[in-house]
Amino acid sequence: MAPEIRPTPRNHSAILYQSNCQNLYVLDIPASISLAQHPRVSSGAAHVDNLEETSTIFSCPPSEIPYSTEPKGAKAMLRVMESIPSCELEYRKQIATFVRETMCELRTNFVGEYCLPRAVQPRLLQRPRKRGRVDGDATVTNAQCSIEPDLSITATCFEADAPPLVLAPGVNMLPGLNSIQTVAVKNNSISAAILQVKNYYTTSADENLLEERMGKTMPFHTERFRVPPQATFVLTHLPTEPNHLPELPIIFFNGKIFDFILMDPPWPNRSVRRSAHYQTTPTFNHLQTLLCGILERNLRPEVGIAAIWTTNNVNSRSTARESLENSGLQVFEEWIWVKTTSKGVPVSPICGLWRQPYEVLILGRKPSNTQDEKPTVRRRVIVGVPDIHSRKPHLKELVEQHFFNADYLEGYKALEVFARNLTAGWWSCGDEVLRFNWDGWWA
């Protein structure tokens, strides 16, 4: 049976609730991604192309009941507590208190659904760790097509002053993803463009090339990717190893400057290293060097705003803060994504020792010249029912609402680093930048 699909809300907003003081939001995550495929979501612009026909991104069923990941037994809990620095315990206590108070306010003032009905495609599988070879002829079955494609590219070789690839309206054919790696791919149109890419079923892109040269016919089919209006992306491995960091200045081509930079770094984490979803960077130090380099070269001086997602790991949070501070920025806000069930209950204990039901986005900007002392950090809560692994709430609507007024909305420049989907009007970069713009993810 085909999945039941509910269109994106007609008011063109993923915000299901917001408090009067704008410190508390309920945000539908799939809708936030779907609406980010169109320019100026929050501007109310009447001329936005086909917004009434916004596609719906496939999702997973919402969580219905909370769970606990706490250590079993008093001894295990004590060992975990002893491993956490006292400053981290104090920070978690502050966050937990703020979240509890905010959730209490939400239950008082909001009566409604915490997420919209989701389009769930049961045959859509996330890609496995390794792709097996497909033998035989080039015919591909429907079952194979329902698997998320392998988007891996070969090792990046940066090319200074490489010209951008400007997409034509409609369908653009590509021989493979390697043909566009490290190239700025632009859709200058007010309508979405399509990339149609040849995709081989082998375990290695290098193996594809070798067997092509040997004259063998490799099984393949084409994958389609949607490029939103006025979006630009760079498909690339961001340099995180020390011997590659000197190549950083030429990644973004001719010193492109942005008003807003959003980063979701692949923080080193044992559980993530065991996962098949993505590889993490080798060390926090290497990652900090990369983050600082991007901020120093690509964030607009004086008025630019940077935002870095962190995990509930003291090292990721300190690295994010140090990256902002070492780039001349000052932390001024924290946005706390609280993960809840469909009924608005946190998915795990707020004061959990092993895992917390929230992630924190740290925002920084240049300090005011008239500022004599460190300002109070403003906190906001974004309540959202988790989606599939690695998807976060898309923040375009909130960013535009808080930082770019109607006069400036038309011309601000934004960049998402380590992106997993494209955004209308923004630049995006990373080795998974096309992942959720694969046509198979969309109803």
Regions found by a protein language model. Name each.
Residues M1-M263, W267-C292, N313-A443:
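Class I S-adenosyl-L-methionine
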